[in-house]
Design a protein with these regions (language model features):
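N-terminal [4Fe-4S]-dependent radical SAM core
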Residues: 1-13, 63, 431-434, 438, ...
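Charged, amphipathic alpha-helical linkers/stalks
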Residues: 371-421
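Accessory C-terminal segments flanking Radical SAM cores
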Residues: 245-358, 362
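Radical SAM enzyme [4Fe-4S]-AdoMet core and its adjacent flexible, acidic
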Residues: 142-153, 160, 164-266, 271, ...
């Protein structure tokens, strides 16, 4: 150890199959510098699954974790079959029962997804995310079968299956890899048409040695592509959560990012391959052959040992491990230097800004300009009242500053409650599609009111029954019910 406090892992990417049934030409696993997949077992052996589950349980117990997330990944995880995935889920539940909450997700290309898989995932409460790059034209630029056939119809069928009332609660979202040759607004529209609970828009993995495709003379076309979607998303009243934009907004307000591609939060994720070896993030496969390797495995090493690896330690030190250029940047708290893999350059390794530096700067500044009430609102991550103001108010001697702090805190809370109901309701399985559509329409009214007459909106949100209604709705949603049907 280097004297730092070890930050435990709470997310584990468990590779259950190392091969794939598609041949996507932008895949970082098969088309990148690291080719370690060639020497690994296709399906995870039972001994590896059992030992991985035990190691995760040991780590949870040692660090008294209240929750761990396991993502079943590949390759294509559904190639492991229903029986193979069930065996892995049994091992995970057995090892973690009584220790902490276990959240399991699976990320799939969707082409094999059917009712039998969904019934298994329903039985074990497994969330399902699917990769789709847009409409048929956009998706089929890269996501094809080996013989060149389109994968779109099979993936669309899988998404419709997940969107049905029976399995809607399993649907965790869609993941889209950006290609600037595709029309951004059309991509956004085609994804939103599936009514996913959330979207993720990913920059294609690239490095300074292997930069992303760009039109000659354009330094920020990825930012421009994302900005077109952000502006449409905002104009639509934020009908779906988009992780990239949510993370920028949250980090601008002083919070944490929901993605390793942004922000300064320490990495808390470990990959476990089908042969039981521990690896760092899969994205590092684009840097050089062996880049994600740790030299450690589940049979010999604890997860604490993995977290002591220099590559992981570097991503737990925040701003201290960024390049000098990044440390001087005004948006470093939000950008965080970009994804670690995207900083790689031969000779200087990862001590560089992201190969998407100009794009990230432009995108973050655009979001900040469109949401001025968010920018610099660091109070979201701290107490609404300073200690001095709290003491003054408690003693009955609070002055204008203390009262102002209290007023701002109450205003923030009033505004946050409807947003919390909206976000929870969109993803709740008990909320039928017509009700979600009404929620979107109501949210659009709030967004327009906030833009046109924020004072009037504050008056509405200050109604004495708003808090009671919102708390009641959140309680119903957390118990698996619909939002309050009696609310007008």
């Amino acid at each position: 150890m280097d004297g730092r406090v070890l930050i435990p892992a709470d997310q584990f990417v468990l590779k259950v199959h190392s091969r794939c049934d598609l041949a996507c030409d932008h895949c970082y696993v098969y088309e990148s510098a690291d080719q370690s997949w060639r020497g690994r077992p296709m399906a995870i052996p039972s001994a590896v699954a059992a030992r991985a589950a035990t190691r995760i349980a040991e780590h949870a117990k040692t660090h008294e974790l209240s929750r761990v997330e396991v993502v079943l990944h590949g390759g294509e995880p559904l190639l492991a079959g229903v029986a193979g995935l069930r065996a892995v889920l049994v091992e995970l539940e057995r090892a973690l029962e009584g220790l902490c909450r276990l959240d399991v997700k699976v990320h799939t290309n969707g082409v094999l997804l059917n009712e039998k898989f969904c019934e298994l995932f329903d039985e074990y409460g497994v969330g399902v995310g699917i990769s789709l790059d847009g409409d048929r034209v956009a998706n089929d630029r890269h996501r094809k079968y080996r013989d060149g056939r389109s994968s779109y119809d099979a993936v669309a069928r899988a998404i419709r299956l997940l969107s049905a009332d029976r399995f809607r609660h399993l649907f965790s979202g869609l993941l889209c890899t950006i290609d600037t040759a595709n029309d951004p607004v059309r991509v956004y529209e085609s994804l939103v048409e599936f009514d996913p609970p959330r979207l993720d828009l990913l920059l294609p993995h690239a490095t300074w040695d292997e930069p992303p495709p760009r039109t000659a003379g354009s330094a920020t076309e990825y930012a421009d592509w994302l900005i077109a979607i952000f502006d449409r998303w905002q104009a639509d009243g934020y009908p779906v959560r988009i992780r990239t934009f949510d993370s920028i907004i949250d980090t601008l307000a002083g919070g944490d990012s929901a993605t390793e591609a942004l922000g300064l939060a320490p990495v808390r994720m470990v990959v476990i391959e089908t042969d039981g070896t521990y690896e760092q993030a899969d994205s590092l496969k684009v840097a050089f052959d062996g880049a994600p390797a740790t030299g450690l495995d589940v049979f010999t090493h604890s997860l604490d040992s993995v977290l002591e690896h220099p590559g992981i330690a570097a991503r737990q030190r925040g701003i201290a491990d960024l390049s000098a250029t990044c440390r001087r940047c005004p948006v470093v708290d939000s950008c965080g230097g970009g994804m670690y893999a995207h900083r790689y350059k031969s000779g200087s390794d990862f001590e560089n800004p992201s190969v998407y530096c100009d794009d990230l700067l432009k995108l973050i500044n655009h979001v900040a300009a469109r949401l001025p009430h968010v920018t610099g609102n660091k109070a979201r991550t701290g107490p609404a009242l300073s200690e001095g103001a709290f003491t003054a108010l408690a003693s009955g001697l609070g002055g204008a500053d203390a009262v102002g702090q209290l007023t701002r805190g109450q205003r923030s809370l009033r505004r946050g409650l409807p947003a919390a109901v909206y976000e929870a309701g969109l993803g709740a399985p008990a909320v039928p599609t017509p009700t979600r559509n009404l929620m979107r329409a109501a949210w659009q009214v709030l967004v327009l009111a906030d833009s046109d007459s924020p004072g009037a909106l504050d008056s509405v949100l200050g109604h004495p029954y708003l808090r009671a209604w919102a708390v009641r709705c959140l309680g119903r949603l957390s118990r698996g019910g619909a939002a309050d049907r009696d609310a007008d």
